[in-house]
Amino acid sequence: MASQGTKRSYEQMETGGERQNATEIRASVGRMVGGIGRFYIQMCTELKLSDYEGRLIQNSITIERMVLSAFDERRNKYLEEHPSAGKDPKKTGGPIYRRRDGKWMRELILYDKEEIRRIWRQANNGEDATAGLTHLMIWHSNLNDSTYQRTRALVRTGMDPRMCSLMQGSTLPRRSGAAGAAVKGVGTMVMELIRMIKRGINDRNFWRGENGRRTRIAYERMCNILKGKFQTAAQRAMMDQVRESRNPGNAEIEDLIFLARSALILRGSVAHKSCLPACVYGLAVASGYDFEREGYSLVGIDPFRLLQNSQVFSLIRPNENPAHKSQLVWMACHSAAFEDLRVSSFIRGTRIVPRGQLSTRGVQIASNENMETMDSSTLELRSRYWAIRTRSGGNTNQQRASAGQISVQPTFSVQRNLPFERATIMAAFTGNTEGRTSDMRTEIIRMMESARPEDVSFQGRGVFELSDEKATNPIVPSFDMSNEGSYFFGDNAEEYEN
């Protein structure tokens, strides 16, 4: 994008840093993941986990959730003011899985939040290290994006379930900061805004008084975040209209849904980062790797290289396919839930199957599931090639408008065409171009109609051998142009439930 000079890179957002040069960014991102690794090692010691148990992704997730809960100021305050039966506001915990006599056992643990905060700070040179917490949130969000569908949430806000490719980051907590905002998809932002407008319609005092002033500031900030994701003048102008509305109502909801639909072809810029489970960073730190000295990037070769050398295990239910479980976690690790399957498969070096064909449920195990029949297997998280993660929507011809398949938000900066069914998308735009945004709507529709599915995005960009860390020899893959590339077709995944 043209305004790149004024933007902080997403590593800077991630580490809360001011403008830094590349080396400083690599060092501060390294410091962040190194802190996560040190914390994880300390927790494994506290819990007396064996090496194998410490590499179990379910244990990693429990430990990550505990530290996120320990630092959730708002919820902690709420829990103290509204004591609920059987919930100690000062404690946090979850299931820890241990191997006993050839079987997996579940043990529910409980810790003082204060104690967890102490261990986290100690691992992070005495600082709160909010960036590391956000990093863990984004990893959980990427895992949710790969695992669950948000059809119900889309329908509730009046959007079309086929817009699922716009929903990256829809389960991120509000406190995820600038790094969180960068990875949220257009649909996620639209949904948050619609929910806000609906509350305003139903509750007369929502925009009023001292609280209402704060609400209004939050509303305008969310509008600006969404505006920044759009890459065409007309879409941005419409966002200005929505933001400046005296009292936002149904007209604004209409405009937002129109914009969300338009983003299926005129895609927004959404950042992608490879955020790995805490145990992966822990393994590397334990083996003596110094992240801060070596430097680390979330968007380059580093996460690929880390996964090449990490052995992570997962619990497997009786009729689940371990290869499918691996695919789910691989996609989550690279934030590739909405990427074209042709591209992901090429990079991974094994065919990635659409979610409707996966024989696996989510990674987390519910408390009522029977542990007797649980097995465990190694997750295959290695890749054949690596590629640079993108923050653009892959729009062609000078970043204006291009083809967007109903279900792709590119993750990797790799040349491909973006197959899309224009008829399906354009059918959603019949009629309504009157009202105060009519000229912008007309302009947006005109740009969408001129988009061609055969246009190539990320021209000349390729993947790299894992030995090519300086990215000197791009290998540009050739894809079967007609091949449909979406993960969500024929979907039968579970809904995301909080």
Curated annotation (Swiss-Prot):
Cysteine pairings via disulfide bonds: none
Its family?
Answer: Belongs to the influenza viruses nucleoprotein family.
Q: Which segments carry the region annotation Disordered?
A: 1-21
Query: What name does the UniProt record give this protein?
Result: Nucleoprotein
Short sequence motif Unconventional nuclear localization signal: positions? 1-18
Q: Which InterPro entries match?
A: Flu_NP
- What is the species of this protein? Influenza A virus (strain A/Teal/China/2978.1/2002 H5N1 genotype W)
Q: Does the keyword Ribonucleoprotein apply?
A: yes
| Subcellular localization, as worded in the UniProt entry | Virion; Host nucleus
